[in-house]
Design a protein with these regions (language model features):
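Glycine-rich phosphate/pyrophosphate-binding loop and the adjoining helix
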Residues: 1-56
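Sensory modules in modular signal-transduction proteins
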Residues: 86-128
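Generic detection of long, well-ordered alpha-helical segments
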Residues: 21, 25, 91, 156-159
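Juxtadomain coupling helices with adjacent low-complexity linkers
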Residues: 55-87, 94-95, 101-105, 211-241
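A general structural signal for well-ordered secondary-structure junctions
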Residues: 41, 111, 172-175
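Sensory/regulatory domains in signal-transduction proteins
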Residues: 116-123, 127-223
Length: 241
């Protein structure tokens, strides 16, 4: 095919020979099946029930303040002497002030949250004046709360989903868990990405959640590349009808 590239592709870069297309699709299908078989060789660890009530304090847990105290941030900041404002913080490869870190995180095109390995909800990048404009609604009083409190309005079946996500990442059964929230309004693909955070020794240190509307990213990609979704499975095409 490479020796006859002019005949093999049309002016828009699409393969013209249907037999070649079918052959390549079969190769992709076989590869995907192979990956599926190999993945099953590594059996996932069984998921134990998660303690969403923060009953197992870790080294960084502040026990003097109740986790669900709506003024948890202010009280813990006073107890720990937490720095703020223009105080410099040495990071992994850089030095920023606390204000710069705040600005940097708020400028991210995502809603970010972090809960530690004791299932305590410690942080979200509070970039929205109105929580109702968030894809995953959070309010300042939730910082520090137990995960059972943060998700307290969920029915039991969905709380089991929360436990499954945390347990899956804690066990290393998956590198990440991604989901699209159904029932979103037109123009919104409400995407949630849950990623494990690890200590230097490789042990589980908590979970980082990224929430964003994937639709503008998808639209930008298609417009920039001149592609559009094709009817063929797992495919994007140039000039495809």
């Amino acid at each position: 095919m490479l020796g006859k590239a002019k005949e093999a592709f049309d002016l828009e870069g699409n393969i013209t020979n249907e037999g070649t297309i079918n052959f390549l699709e079969q190769c992709l299908d076989n590869f995907i099946q192979y990956v599926g078989v190999v993945s099953k060789l590594k059996r996932p660890k069984p998921i134990e029930p998660e303690d969403l009530d923060c009953n197992k304090p870790i080294a960084t847990t502040v026990t003097e303040v109740d986790h669900d105290d709506p003024e948890w941030v202010e009280k813990v900041a006073e107890i720990t002497g937490a720095v703020s404002g223009d105080t410099y913080v040495k990071l992994d490869h850089g030095i920023l002030t606390v204000n710069q870190i705040d600005m940097f995180l708020k400028a991210m095109p995502f809603e970010l949250t972090y809960a530690d390995d004791n299932n305590q909800f410690l942080y979200y990048n509070n970039a929205h004046q109105d929580p109702d404009t968030m894809l995953a609604k959070h309010v300042p009083s939730q910082s520090g709360s137990r995960m059972s409190t943060v998700h307290g309005s969920l029915p039991p079946a969905r709380m089991k989903n929360v436990e499954w996500v945390i347990g899956t990442l804690r066990n290393g059964n998956q590198e990440y868990v991604r989901t699209i929230v159904p029932g979103s309004p037109e123009g919104v693909i409400n995407t949630h990405n849950y990623q494990a955070v690890y200590y230097d020794d490789g042990s589980y240190a908590g979970i980082n959640e990224i929430v964003f509307n994937f639709k503008p990213w998808l639209d930008w990609y298609l417009e920039t590349t001149g592609q559009r979704p094709c009817r063929r499975k797992r495919s994007f095409c140039t000039g495809c009808n």
